[in-house]
A protein has these predicted regions:
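N-terminal pre-domain/capping segments
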Residues: 1-88
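Active-site beta-loop-alpha junctions enriched in small/polar residues
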Residues: 19-21, 39-41, 68-71, 102-103, ...
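Acidic-and-aromatic substrate-binding clefts and catalytic sites of carbohydrate-active enzymes
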Residues: 23, 40-52, 71-81, 151-159, ...
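Acidic (Asp/Glu)-rich catalytic clusters
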Residues: 25-31, 48-65, 81-96, 133-138, ...
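Conserved, mostly hydrophobic/aromatic
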Residues: 36, 98, 143, 179, ...
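Gly/Pro-rich active-site loop or hairpin
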Residues: 47, 77, 115-121, 125, ...
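Active-site acidic/histidine proton-transfer and metal-coordination neighborhood
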Residues: 79-176
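C-terminal helical cap(s) of enzyme catalytic domains, especially alpha/beta-barrels
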Residues: 260-280
């Protein structure tokens, strides 16, 4: 069944991030996986092993692109060279939708290579929405933006993070990649109620979920993607699914990566929540 009515996104089931340590296992064993998510920037090249592996993956699996450097929240214009390379990859993968983060990370052509939070103001929402529309029109593929984990806030913010996310996606007429772990991490770092966040996101625009693990330090939590998903995050995920219906879900595991079997097993834990929601849909 459709994940929701927005932009014709469909439920792809449960996906896994395509990572280098698993290349050989996937190509040789051809495990049963609903889809793979790739980091777009890792494949925006003219040749080499990454593209060769990607082409082999595309012969067997569905692939969705996830970006880390569009920087829709930066004040400067979109990087046209980046968009051109991204479009070549879009045509190669035939990705049904494309995701990137609602953040900033560039100033005057210099890049932090980080996903930094934006001030939650109406002016910032207008800038981000305009850039999302421009990217979508150029790439000719639906776009969904992801909420980032954050460790600092701006005094000038005029609304909550979930209100800002809603404002941006309504203005841009785009989808949401709802990262449930990021909501949990930010809620613990900033002291807001993650349930309130889940309950106020426009459910009809949620095109995809991210779930992941994190690391707890003495005074804060860091979104490290190097542990299994904890129970409170699964509970938030289930609550979100009750609002969205069955929706494409992706497990991220990017550091201290275990065997493919262990990552796959962790991802498949989402199935019981998807099936429970499907029964009542």
């Amino acid at each position: 069944m459709p994940a929701n009515a927005f932009n014709g996104f469909t439920d792809y089931g449960i996906g896994i991030g395509l990572r280098v340590p698993h290349y050989n296992h996937i190509l040789s064993e051809k495990p049963t996986v609903d889809w793979f998510e790739i980091i777009s920037e890792n494949f925006m090249c003219d040749g080499g092993r990454p593209l060769k592996v990607l082409d082999q993956i595309l012969e067997q699996y569905r692939v969705v692109q996830h970006g880390v450097s569009a920087y829709f929240g930066s004040a400067e214009p979109l990087n046209r060279e980046h968009l051109k390379k991204l479009k070549r990859l879009v045509l190669r993968t035939n990705t049904p939708w494309l995701t990137d983060h609602l953040c900033w990370g560039s100033v005057d052509g210099r890049y932090t290579h980080d996903l930094l939070p934006v001030p939650y103001t109406f002016a910032a929402a207008r800038v981000a929405a305009a850039k999302i529309r421009q990217a979508r029109d150029f790439l000719e593929v639906p776009i969904a933006v992801e909420n980032v984990s954050s460790y600092a806030e701006f005094h000038v913010s005029e609304m909550t993070e979930w209100e800002f996310l809603s404002e941006v996606v309504e203005r841009a007429d785009c989808g949401i990649l709802l990262d449930v772990n990021n909501i949990y991490v930010s809620s613990r770092n900033h002291g807001f109620d993650p349930v309130e966040y889940i309950d106020h996101v426009p459910a009809g625009r949620v095109a995809q979920f991210h779930i992941a693990g994190h690391t707890r330090f003495r005074k804060y939590i860091l979104d490290t993607h190097d542990h299994p998903v904890i129970d409170p995050v699964w509970q938030l995920y289930e609550r979100a699914l009750r609002r969205t219906g069955p929706t494409a879900t992706l497990l991220e595991w990017d550091a201290r990566i275990p065997s493919f079997a262990e990552v796959h097993h962790e991802a498949l834990k989402a199935r019981r929540f998807l099936e429970k929601v499907a029964v009542h849909a």
